Design a protein with these regions (language model features):
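Short, loop-centered acidic/histidine patches that primarily coordinate divalent metals
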Residues: 52-54, 86
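N-terminal presequence-like segments and adjacent domain-start helices
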Residues: 1-27, 39-42, 73, 81-93
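Short amphipathic beta-strand starts and helix->beta connectors
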Residues: 28-36
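Short, non-transmembrane amphipathic alpha-helical segments
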Residues: 55-79
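Short, aliphatic-rich beta-strand segments
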Residues: 45-52
Length: 96
């Protein structure tokens, strides 16, 4: 039996987009122009938060890092979180 879901697209890219959107709603202090994406590093997936376009949001995000870790783990978005400004890594948090 074949099921067709015309109301939504079940691709991994769309699933990731929805998960990152949900992440943003749960982390309300994150600036809108902070770039949020996932990257593969060897055998791990890392959640990257790039503050190049919103340096003012980095301080409040660093203060709320425990919340970032909890939400990232809850949604299964990665094994680590990187806070960065462009290509420069500011903080790296490995999730347990």
């Amino acid at each position: 039996m074949s099921y067709q879901h015309s109301s939504f697209d079940c691709t991994s890219a769309n699933f990731e987009k929805a998960a990152l959107s949900h992440f943003r709603t749960l982390v309300a202090f994150l600036p809108d122009n902070c770039r949020v994406y996932r990257q593969t590093w060897e055998f791990s997936t890392v959640l990257c938060l790039d503050f190049l376009a919103c340096l003012e949001g980095l301080a409040i995000t660093r203060q709320n890092c425990a919340h970032l870790v909890n939400v990232t783990q809850e949604l299964g978005l990665g094994q680590a979180i990187i806070l960065k400004v462009g290509n420069k890594i500011i903080e790296w948090h490995r999730l347990s």
